């Protein structure tokens, strides 16, 4: 398997940002880490090994990004607006710096996939919904898609609202976005077992919104034995990859 340990300077975040590449060909899969995780986490917890057959066949190549969650949504000493503004800086890094860097490394200029587990699933779905011109496939595993989970009630703060998928999706009526959502491949999965309860309300609210807006998506509920844990994500990711058009 082709592996590269990479880094580049981010002007938006004013620091060196680290990322790893796994694979030599195929659609680019941008991976967001779980809560406070690093660019090494996806490999360390066996997700790359779980998807090895897809990588070695040249069907996908993974790029695992660094996180700034500890300075944004997990920075509980900040007020909600400042948490959201740090996330916005990270968004600018991803879209304006990381994605061009990855494209330059690979020569891939078609639509990308994004994925993540737990908080990474929140990022994956949020980035897809905000940038469906960049990401045309998403696999979100065990996420919480409501910004209130991180900041509490936020009233009319637009910076938070614009990063709370269960809220802004209801008011997304722009045909440019809706058309791209309808053309995309979307998987949102949750288990019903231990530690999955936090994500269930937003999972069902999202499903309702997608249904009402006639956006095709696979909202997959796995069983009551399926916990919020890497053991299950290692099973889910290759399963869903096997059902997407790669």
Annotate each language-model stretch with its function.
Residues 1-246:
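Non-catalytic cap/lid and distal C-terminal segments of serine-dependent acyl enzymes
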